[in-house]
From Swiss-Prot:
GO MF annotation terms: 4-hydroxyphenylpyruvate dioxygenase activity; metal ion binding
Biological processes per GO annotation: tyrosine catabolic process
InterPro entries xrefs: 4OHPhenylPyrv_dOase, 4OHPhenylPyrv_dOase_C, Glyas_Bleomycin-R_OHBP_Dase, Glyas_Fos-R_dOase_dom, VOC
Protein name: Uncharacterized protein slr0090
Binding site for Fe cation: H144, H222, E306
PROSITE patterns reported for this sequence: VOC (PS51819)
Keyword Iron in annotation: yes
Keywords: Iron, Metal-binding, Repeat
Entry annotated with the keyword Iron: yes
Amino acid sequence: MEFDYLHLYVDDYQSAHRCYQRQWGFTCVNKIITDQGITGIYQQGQILLLISASESSLSRYADYLQKHPPGVGEVAWQVANWQKIQHQLSELQIETTPVIHPLTKAEGLTFLLWGDVHHSIYPVRSELNQNKTLHGVGLTTIDHVVLNIAADQFTQASQWYQQVFGWSVQQSFTVNTPHSGLYSEALASANGKVQFNLNCPTNNSSQIQTFLANNHGAGIQHVAFSTTSITRTVAHLRERGVNFLKIPTGYYQQQRNSSYFNYASLDWDTLQCLEILLDDQDNTGERLLLQIFSQPCYGVGTLFWEIIERRHRAKGFGQGNFQALYEAVETLEKQLEVP
């Protein structure tokens, strides 16, 4: 199993087109216009990003946007065990709808789960054709997707993904600040190509609760794109006007004081200048998670993006980075006076 594409539902197609092409480095490889609306298909590396805006109040996109702010309204996967998943969906009485892949024209299925986010599955296809014009700013693949969900739905959702998609829990942790908190599980497919995280709030003041309130229900909090050089990619993105979350004061000094980091292999000045988070997985300074998070795209408590570099095949997620992200979002909420 692996990611196929993300589908972003927006109010203003032209504005989104300019943002993701000029700032994020995606190339529009096709455009589909129907009586339902307009859909642009964008590629960078092996990433497919669909962007749709509605031309009809009766379209799927319009229905989503009447309930939620702009965001990821569909996540699609390629699956090898197509018939098995189809049978399980039928047994669970989940209503599915036939769908045609917007680029390959392969037949697939789509169905709704938490927060009006469509889940779509297609047969496994060959890798996307690439050339230098599709390199963009160096984003290569979809690394992981994060779903925020209410606490009373969390266990059901986790068990569903494990039962139907065959994912397993790789990590779980709780993050707390003096004013907020969350619980998170990191799920992954057997081949490791799909990583899908679930977050739920642990109290009413949690920023996950803020997201659920602003999104009017469960939804995709953020998506991470992989890169082989996060410093180069982030430098390009900043030059193009992409804004990222501010890192808490003292973060880098605290990391430099940690005895397990291999100082010689890290360009601390560049990391601090670009505000990139880092987490060591094996206490050698080699298997590093390097991450950075954009500011929310549609106001506080909505979708944002992540850039991630996994050095020496670093796996999973660093709780230290997760804590720093959580504190950075909380600081932003306070600055904007979000209750």
